[in-house]
Structure formats: structure tokens, C-alpha cells
């Protein structure tokens, strides 16, 4: 089974979050740093908000931080593009009857917006949202759970991801 990440792997969206982070921090007079990026990149929303609150010593609640991020990113996902070669590869895999699923740290509404707009959902059996499970992609329990969900041995899965 082929498992695909979305942001940065299938679609060109990583700059969306850099732009959101820069704007969020600028509103508070804070710099966008490598240390900040490393703390929030490729993690699930609630953990990124917790990190942001603590790292930046903000009075905002984690819920308010996430709501502001959602507002800043809402239109961006309607304008992302497919990474070069992705559509042809997915089409080839589908023609070869390969099983494919999406596993993402992206927020569900952003994922659905982008994937539906780009016509990519038709290639995947389903989507697993790390955020809904409360498990980061770097945690092997996520991948073991995904394999179990699809009734396949983990050793038979191939992962396409830009961050692991």
C-alpha cells in the first residue's frame, strides 16, 4: 500500500504555513526564527499551538491561536498547486491498481479544500488525519494504526513524505 503525505509532497503548500506564521508573529511584533519554524513545522495543530503559546509567551489561548491560523490560511488552500509529476504518478498507480491512502498533519478543512479543488481525492481510498487521532506523524503508532486500518502489514507499505 502506498501512503502519501499531502503538504509539500502532493501539493505545493509549505509556504502557506510559513506565510501564516510570519503574519501571526508580525502581528505581535515577534520575529520568525528557525527555532520557531522547527517547533511548529510538520506537527499537528494543537501541539503547534501549545508550542507557540509557550515559545512566544503569549496570553492567547491555544484555541484562539488555532482560530487565527485558520483565518489566515483559509483562502490559501484554494490556490495551491499540484507538485510536478504528482498527477501522472497517481494516475499510473491507479492504472496499476495500487492501493493508496492519504495520511496528513494538515487541518481537515484545508486538506479537503485543496484535494477537491485539484481533483486528487479520486486516487485515494481515504484520508487519515493525524490531528483527529492526536498523534504526530513522527510517532510510529500512527503508521502502525494506519496499516492496521487498511488490513496490511506495515512492512508492505511505502511512504511518500517530505518531512520524515
Question: Can you annotate each of these PLM segments?
Answer:
Residues 1, 101, 157-158:
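Hydrophobic "anchor" residues on beta-strands that sit immediately upstream
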Residues 1-87, 91-96:
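N-terminal helical cap/lid subdomain that shapes the substrate entry/recognition surface
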Residues 5, 9, 104, 162:
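Conserved G/P- and acidic residue-centered "switch" motifs that form tight phosphate/ATP-binding loops
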Residues 17, 161-162:
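Acidic donor-binding loop at a coil-to-helix junction in glycosyltransferase catalytic cores
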Residues 40, 103-105, 160:
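Structural motif
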Residues 75-102, 108-112, 137-140, 144:
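Short, acidic loop-to-helix structural element flanking the phosphoryl-transfer center
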Residues 79, 107-158, 164:
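Substrate-recognition "cap/lid" segment bordering the active-site pocket of phosphatases
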Amino acid at each position: 500500500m502506498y501512503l502519501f503525505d499531502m503538504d509539500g509532497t502532493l501539493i505545493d503548500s509549505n509556504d502557506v504555513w510559513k506565510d501564516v506564521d510570519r503574519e501571526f508573529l508580525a502581528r505581535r511584533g515577534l520575529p520568525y526564527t528557525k527555532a520557531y519554524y522547527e517547533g511548529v513545522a510538520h506537527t499537528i495543530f494543537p501541539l503547534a499551538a501549545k508550542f507557540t503559546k509557550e515559545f512566544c509567551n503569549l496570553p492567547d489561548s491555544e484555541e484562539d491561536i488555532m482560530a487565527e491560523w485558520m483565518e489566515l490560511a483559509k483562502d490559501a488552500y484554494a490556490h495551491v498547486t499540484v507538485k510536478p509529476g504528482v498527477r501522472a504518478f497517481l494516475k499510473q498507480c491507479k492504472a496499476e491498481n495500487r492501493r493508496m491512502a492519504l495520511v496528513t498533519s494538515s487541518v481537515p478543512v484545508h486538506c479537503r479544500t485543496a484535494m477537491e479543488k485539484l481533483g486528487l481525492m479520486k486516487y485515494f481510498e481515504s484520508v487519515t488525519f493525524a490531528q483527529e487521532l492526536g498523534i504526530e506523524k513522527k510517532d510510529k503508532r500512527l503508521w502502525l494504526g494506519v496499516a492496521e486500518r487498511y488490513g496490511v502489514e506495515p512492512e508492505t507499505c511505502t511512504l511518500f513524505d517530505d518531512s520524515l
